[in-house]
Every structure is written in C-alpha cells, then in structure tokens.
Amino acid sequence: MIRILLSNDDGISAPGIQTLASALREFAQVQIVAPDRNRSGASNALTLDSALRITTLSNGDIAVQQGTPTDCVYLGVNALMRPRPDIVVSGINAGPNLGDDVIYSGTVAAAMEGRHLGYPALAVSLNGHQHYDTAAAVTCRLLRALQRKPLRTGKILNINVPDLPLSEIKGIRVTRCGSRHPAEQVFCQQDPRGQDLYWIGPPGEKYDAGPDTDFAAVEQGYVSITPLQVDLTAYTAQEVVESWLANTEVDGEW
C-alpha cells in the first residue's frame, strides 16, 4: 500500500484536505501533517526562531501549531511519519495556483519541500471552492497511475483542476506557467486608535495566458499539470552574465 504524507496551506480542517484524505484512504495509507490554521501565501517559509508544537487528533492526523506548510512537510518526513512516505501530496487548495501564484503559494511550497527532501510530490489546487470531489478524483487517478508506472522526472507536478463536476472535465493538459502583471493594490484602513492598517490587494491581471499555459487549460475546462523544479538556476542566462562580467571592471583587482 502506498504511503502518502498529506499537507496543505489552508489548515488541517479545510474541506480540501479532508475531502482528499477520505478519497486517498480508500487505497493508500495517509498521514496528515498540516498547519493548525490557514497559512495561505506562506510560500517556503521555515520556522527557525521558535520551537514547533504538534497536536495529534483522535484519528491520527497531526496539526502543527503556527506551523507553515514547509514546516509540516519537513517534520512529517524527518520526524512524524514512520515508516517514511512514498510520496508527498499537498492540497486540495481552495483556489488556483496558476502562473506567478506559485511563487507565493504555500500549497506549492509544501510539495516543493517534499521534492527537496527527495520524494515525488504533487500540489493540487481547485479553481474555486465547490467541487473538491472532482479534484480528489483526479488526484487519485494520477496517483494510481504513478503506482503502476512511476514518473522519474525529479520534478514537482503542480495540478490545477477546474471547479466543475467530474463529468464536465474535458481532459488533462501538460502546461507551462503563465504570467500576471505585477500586483499593485494596497488597501489602507485605520483602527479605532487611528493607526493605519494595510491589506494586500488581489493579484495582477493575466498578461501571458497563451494556449499552452496553465491559465488557458483551466479556463477551457482541462486539468492543468505543470512540472516545476527546485533548481531555480536560469541556465540560458549564464553566458549572458559571463559576457557582461567580462566587459565590465567589476571582476578586477580587489
């Protein structure tokens, strides 16, 4: 039986992770290690300045108090799940993680930590807040396929599912990340003492949503699978930077 470490960024009681856990437990051994509260947008934050406490629920699920998604996967792999998992799954997120969203996403970060620690990893997001059962069914189908025929790319699979009944899903597309215009909105309010409070506004509008992007696939009713990698090196820019450095006086005598 496949062993799955399951986490998220919406918190342990969120409907997405609970729906997915129920579906996965029909054919897998599942250990939930998830934040005790919503940590959306936490990205790859790792808690290094304080100790982490856990709460083990009656069903064996583990909530990490004030933990980030990355904390949860780190603890799950290195301390809390024994034997260790075969794969790390993050989700189901309430809302998509498309394009530049992956930079901020705690859902993607949890999967990224799993991959960084040497495990196959999936991040699963629903483009809405209704059909979690659809996203769970898609995830189960993919995991069963991975059991039959492992995918040895060393990459994270970022999966985004349209918020539709399963019967209306048109298929699956392998995509690239689209892009958004930079977000610029900030909302300012005042508390009762007259102190300013700031709220970060919505993400920027899409500007690269071409037919091969994750944006386009989900909008057209397809499941989007985007391979992501931990290595952030821009290999195609290395020669450009080398040439620039050779034509400047930066790398001279110190």
From Swiss-Prot:
Key word Metal-binding present: yes
Gene Ontology cellular component annotations, sorted alphabetically: cytoplasm
EC number(s) given by UniProt: 3.1.3.5, 3.1.3.6, 3.6.1.11
Top-level lineage group: Bacteria
One Gene Ontology MF term: exopolyphosphatase activity
Subcellular location: Cytoplasm
Keywords assigned by UniProt, alphabetized: Cytoplasm, Hydrolase, Metal-binding, Nucleotide-binding
Binding sites annotated in the UniProt record for a divalent metal cation: 9-10, 40, 93
Top EC group: hydrolase
The protein's required cofactors: a divalent metal cation
Catalytic reactions of this protein: a ribonucleoside 5'-phosphate + H2O = a ribonucleoside + phosphate; a ribonucleoside 3'-phosphate + H2O = a ribonucleoside + phosphate; [phosphate](n) + H2O = [phosphate](n-1) + phosphate + H(+)
Cofactor details (free text): Binds 1 divalent metal cation per subunit.
UniProt-listed NCBIfam families: PRK00346.1-1, PRK00346.1-3, PRK00346.1-4, surE
Protein family according to the UniProt entry: Belongs to the SurE nucleotidase family.
Role this protein plays: Nucleotidase with a broad substrate specificity as it can dephosphorylate various ribo- and deoxyribonucleoside 5'-monophosphates and ribonucleoside 3'-monophosphates with highest affinity to 3'-AMP. Also hydrolyzes polyphosphate (exopolyphosphatase activity) with the preference for short-chain-length substrates (P20-25). Might be involved in the regulation of dNTP and NTP pools, and in the turnover of 3'-mononucleotides produced by numerous intracellular RNases (T1, T2, and F) during the degradation of various RNAs.
Name of the featured protein: 5'/3'-nucleotidase SurE
Provenance organism: Yersinia pseudotuberculosis serotype O:1b (strain IP 31758)
